[in-house]
Amino acid sequence: MTKVITYGTFDLFHEGHYRLLQRAKALGDYLIVGVTTENCDRARGKLNVVDDLMTRIENVRKSGFADEIIIEETIGQKASDVQKYKVDIFAVGSDRIGNFDYMEDYCKVVYLERTKDVPSTMPQNQVFKIQRIGIIGTGRIAGRFLKEAKCVSGSSVQGVYNPHKESAELFATKYEIDVFNTLEELYKKAEIVYVASPHETHYEYVKDALEHDKHVICEKPFVLSKTQAKVLFDIAKQRNRILFEGIKTAYCPGFTKLIEVARSGLIGNIRYVDACFTKLENKESRELTDIQYGGSFLELGSYCLLPIIKLLGCGHGEISYDSICDERHIDLFTKASLRFPKGLATITCGLGVKSEGRLLVAGTKGYIVAEAPWWKTTYFEVHYEDASKVEKYSERFWGDGLRYEISDMLNQINGNHKSEFKLTEAESIIMAGIMEEFLEKRKRGNICNI
């Protein structure tokens, strides 16, 4: 008798789960299915599990393919299960190719073809449905988003659109998803649109998606003018759609905790915020070759503006910019100084100059410091006048962090609006206005001073 084992969360049981179990069963005579506990999922960074364990087990049983159901409670359990149950074949979806090659030491490993087109319709007894996602854009961030979406229960990436069809086909082949030849095709297969196209195209793509009654996550920078941002949020409200800017930092637990501590009064009144984010980018990258919309500030400025706006407010005054530019006037390094009614702030961004990146929040009783990469906040400290008094905070940060914004989008779609404070409409509008101001000053030659 050939024994096969496979594992999964099997949350919001859908056709993709059914087909996986069907294919696994066909590999042998006896199928063991491991259903993962919510605690185990959390430990490996999977978010948003909706159904309780017993419901998920019952759905697997009802499929009719499982001869035996076990519970996966700990990371690392798979190898011991294979030995315990004398398993011959370990089966897993093809989206995990390479991840379980180590299991070849214990049994044969088979990667099963995944179901690309997961339907959004659900059994009648389920309250929430699978939210299908369509991606616009095929750059690096789109690939990271797709991988992160797999770690959020209740979502399924259906396919990708790029007006350059060859790029879309290469991307779709790499990630085993469909290609949408038109936006209309995408809209028919998705409830959520993720816009990861070049900066200057965001407005038209977001507007079109909203007008087709889609929820939208748009990569930073959201749009490049204050007016455009207002128009898009107005459309979202009129259509009763969820719209937010995808600055991953805003949604991660560590950054949320940092903002809470800063606002709590622990360091007194906040008077100064200094945010620095630099990285050395490839000289041939889009960021350093796009004369109109490339450069450090447009690429990294949103990250630095985020803590400043959240802690000092939306009512900034004059902003001064100083940049080091190349011969094409693309800023390799930009330093911006902002004035607020009750505080000051500085931003430092660089793609061609490396500096010590950190976030500093200074108050009348103490200060908070988070070292690089603070935009993936896992650790920060609170310091006081008494140097011996240091308070330390830490949080997990999973993967690339995009799973947190996907999770928040699903929560809001399902009626839980408690996370709206993480990045508000007003904050995104203000940041869009600052991007607009920067572009205007750069166009007039008032920025590239060095």
Kindly give the residue locations of the regions a language model identified.
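N-terminal Rossmann-like dinucleotide-binding module
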Residues: 129-174, 444, 448-450
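Hydrophobic residues in well-ordered beta-strands that form the structural core
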Residues: 33, 181, 218-219, 243-245, ...
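Beta-loop-alpha module in the N-terminal Rossmann-like domain of NAD(P)-dependent dehydrogenases
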Residues: 145, 175-233
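Nucleotidyltransferase catalytic core that binds NTPs
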Residues: 1-129
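Rossmann-fold dehydrogenase core element
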Residues: 231-248, 269-273
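C-terminal helix-rich "cap/oligomerization" subdomain common to oxidoreductases
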Residues: 172, 185, 192-195, 408-450
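Predominantly a Rossmann-like dinucleotide-binding segment in NAD(P)-dependent oxidoreductases
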Residues: 249-319
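Contiguous beta-strand/loop segments that form the cofactor/metal-binding neighborhood of enzyme cores
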Residues: 305-379, 406-416, 449
